Amino acid sequence: MRVSTGSALISDGRMFRVTVAALGVGQQRRGERSLLVPFERLQSLMQTIALQGGRITAITPVAEAGSASEAAPAAAAEPAKSPAAKAAPKAQASPSKPAAVSASHADVPVNLYKPKDPFVGTVTENYSLLADGAIGRVNHITFDLSGGDPQLRYVEGQSIGIIPDGEDANGKPHKLRLYSIASTRHGDDMVGNTVSLCVRQLQYEKDGETINGVCSTFLCDIEPGAKVKITGPVGKEMLLPEDEDANVIMLATGTGIAPMRTYLRRMFEPAERQKNGWQFKGKAWLFMGAPTTANLLYDEDFERYQSQFPDNFRYTKAISREQQNDKGGRMYIQDRVSENADEIFSWIENPKTHVYMCGLRGMEPGIDEAMTAAAAAKGLNWSELRPQLKKAERWHVETY
């Protein structure tokens, strides 16, 4: 029987309040925070905070927890100052054959929880990812997945469904919405029983009225402690290759950064590398598109990776309202791809290179145009080559 509670029951009822300095994720998480954790998670949390550069200032026992719902799981600890790449991988043969797909991909969990019988998770944190002056509203939201039977587990590159509370205009429950997962399989706190999302509130005009998206607004407004119906996980299109020597090109706009964040944390966060035993040795190149600098998501973390892993990670930004392309127009991600098309193509010629694209569907035509020109310069036809890459499981696209 499925037990959908927000927090796992602890063995002896003891709870501890842990006060930590410099706790959180990226530039939005600073200062001192207090976390309420069960005894069984205390040692794991302490190790994670130490590995990621946080500082525990106090640990205080509190009254016994009367029920699972009273225990608020630990929030994400700020990533430690860990290593960030620039050198292009050596080109090998043409991109006709895929790098071997690990057998572990056959074990990827899918649809552990379905809409008719969803898992009920608990919100542990919800905070803005945007700096002052940003456009719109984007939040980082974390859910506790403890207590499920089966355990709701997932891997990098998958999505989960959220069923918002309430009913539609016809009196029926709202339909689920899928969101790309923004945390690794270990969660932001490395405990292994949380999942995080990166959610932009959808807003559009209709008949002179501003309409807010049902599920995105539900999530951006939700408070810690609230219960949320979750389905999934789903998806095998965006899975990260298991090959430690693979090369990864990432093209993202807006909240399409979510799966890319999971890849990069798995590659470069010290606590991740220690826990999963997966030591990335290849090259990774992230192209990120945003309207303003204030809208760059997880930017501080990516800058840190680039500075600390210069041989393995490269970070290229396209900020449309602040930068100009070579024609004097706004700088979009497709313009950055066009600028670097020859180098990107040299990466793609290496059969170990995978390309991931996630974000607005409007980015695809421009990227295709840039790749078409680069391929033509080499006497190749991009419209024929792209399906070959897709068939070889090296071209991964998730746009909306």
Specify the residue positions occupied by each region the protein language model found.
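Reductase modules of NAD(P)H-dependent flavoproteins
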Residues: R2, G6-G13, A21-R29, K86, ...
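Basic nucleic-acid-binding interfaces
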Residues: T19, G24-V25, G31-L35, M46-L51, ...
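Short aromatic-glycine motifs in intrinsically disordered, low-complexity regions
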Residues: P38, A103-K114, E167-G171
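Conserved hydrophobic positions within beta-strands
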Residues: I56, V123-N126, I181
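Long, low-complexity, charge-dense
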Residues: V62, E70-P83, P115, I135, ...
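Long, low-complexity intrinsically disordered regions
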Residues: S67-V108
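FAD-binding FR-type
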Residues: F143-I249, R265-Q274, S320, Q388, ...
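Ser/Thr-glycine-rich phosphate-binding loops at phosphate-binding pockets of nucleotides
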Residues: A252-P259
